[in-house]
């Protein structure tokens, strides 16, 4: 029996819409050229429908023109430090505070600059701006004379290249780092203009404390009616369901938990319809799981030495009945090295490496919502139970642990 043309077209439309939505969630800045060109075309084709969905359900604005599609995402939890920018060319090292400051100074310099700029010229402008007494008072200084400072700037430039803000015309960053040459870039001004994802310009924020400034940047309109308060909760919860590996009930306020209890089916169904993510509801919380295992920047388990160590420590932590000291985990890694070291890299077996291995593992587990950290210990969260060795104890019907997946975001 032949399928009616209308059904075929509806199915094609739904598939394109889902692919575009997933692409925007994974890469919120899509360019007309490059590896996401196909996804950009779909996002632009369905921009009106996507714009309405994201605005209603998350409060994220979508802008699309002939050069780029930009989903202005903001995180559901502003204080989450587990998703830093990374220098993918150097072991995925997370950005430090210094690199973030350099990034902001570089963006400011590019905004004022011409259509082309050399890396050396960009560095000179950053040094001048960094001399501002207000910045110096924070303890951040840049002379860009030392190799480590130039490496930091090169990492920032590589991020801007990856985002499409810059296009390399000639030269290599390594030549600049070593002092043997310079690099020339085209500045994509429309892409640059779309990077800022705040609801208001930072220059209009007058609060002094960091937390207050951050809150002002993303603040919505005054919640002076039940309708507006419910809308704010719907948007906040949907953002967290889309971005966070697990939404734990005990992280919510009483009002948020009450709203989620009443609207859970509606919220999760809307997300599933658009993205294909599937809700797994358990006693402790909800995880929107991706059957395609694509909408995530962190996986568990992962390949390689660090992935193996992380999995082994997850099994160890799942059996804990309270906080576990970091020193205890380091001791456990030394024990594991004697059993499994033959499968690890040579550097991981060197004396003293257990501290770094623990730090890497705990960072990944925290980013996946499996543990939380204190300065000297690790606290297990319910979803880690899926990595326990042996039978999982079910506390009540439906309380099996939820599988974690950290959604990609930027």
Predicted regions and their residues:
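Eukaryotic partner-binding/assembly regions in large regulatory complexes
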Residues: 1-90, 171-185, 189-293
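Short acidic, hydrophobic short linear motifs in intrinsically disordered regions
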Residues: 24-39, 113-141, 247, 322-349
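Positively charged, polyanion-binding regions of nucleic-acid-associated proteins
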Residues: 25, 96-118, 305-324
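Short amphipathic alpha-helical interaction segments
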Residues: 42-53, 144-162, 350-364
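A short, conserved structural fragment
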Residues: 58-62, 155-157, 161-172, 276-280, ...
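Basic, short loop/linker segments at the boundary and entry of helix-turn-helix/winged-helix-like folds
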Residues: 76-102, 294-306
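Internal, well-ordered domain-core segments that constitute the primary functional module
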Residues: 106-186
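Hydrophobic multi-pass inner-membrane translocation pores used for secretion
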Residues: 225-410
């Amino acid at each position: 029996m032949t399928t009616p043309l209308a059904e075929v077209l509806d199915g094609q439309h739904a598939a394109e819409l889902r692919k575009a939505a997933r692409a925007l969630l994974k890469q919120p800045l899509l360019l007309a050229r490059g590896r996401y060109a196909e996804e950009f075309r779909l996002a632009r084709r369905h921009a009106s429908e996507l714009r309405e969905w994201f605005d209603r359900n998350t409060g994220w604005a979508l802008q699309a023109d002939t050069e780029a599609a930009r989903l202005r995402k903001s995180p559901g939890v502003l204080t989450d430090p587990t998703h830093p920018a990374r220098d993918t060319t150097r072991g995925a090292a997370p950005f430090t505070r210094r690199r973030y400051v350099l990034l902001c100074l570089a963006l400011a310099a590019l905004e004022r600059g011409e259509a082309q700029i050399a890396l050396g010229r960009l560095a000179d402008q950053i040094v001048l701006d960094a001399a501002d007494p207000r910045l110096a008072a924070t303890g951040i200084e840049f002379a860009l004379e030392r190799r480590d400072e130039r490496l930091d700037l090169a990492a920032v430039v590589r991020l801007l290249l990856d985002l499409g803000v810059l296009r390399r015309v000639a030269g290599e960053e390594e030549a600049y780092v070593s002092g043997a040459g310079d690099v020339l870039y085209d500045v994509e001004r429309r892409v640059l203009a779309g990077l800022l994802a705040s609801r208001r310009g930072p220059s209009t924020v007058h609060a002094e404390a960091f937390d207050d400034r951050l809150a002002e940047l993303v603040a919505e309109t005054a919640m002076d009616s039940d309708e507006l308060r419910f809308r704010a909760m719907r948007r906040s919860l949907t953002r967290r369901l889309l971005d966070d590996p697990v939404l734990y009930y005990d992280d919510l306020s009483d009002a948020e938990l009450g709203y989620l209890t009443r609207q859970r089916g509606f919220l999760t169904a809307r997300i599933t319809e658009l993205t294909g993510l599937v809700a797994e509801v358990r006693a402790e919380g909800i995880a929107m799981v991706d059957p395609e295992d694509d909408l995530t920047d962190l996986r568990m388990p992962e390949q390689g030495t660090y992935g193996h160590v992380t999995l082994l420590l997850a099994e160890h932590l799942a059996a804990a009945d309270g906080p576990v000291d970091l020193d205890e985990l380091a001791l456990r890694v030394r024990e594991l090295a004697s059993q499994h070291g033959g499968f690890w890299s040579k550097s991981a077996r060197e004396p003293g490496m257990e501290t770094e291995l623990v730090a890497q593992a705990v960072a990944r587990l925290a980013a996946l919502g499996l543990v939380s950290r204190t300065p000297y210990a690790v606290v297990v969260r319910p979803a880690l139970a899926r990595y326990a060795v042996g039978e999982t104890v079910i506390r009540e019907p439906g309380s099996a642990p939820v599988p974690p997946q950290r959604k990609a975001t930027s």
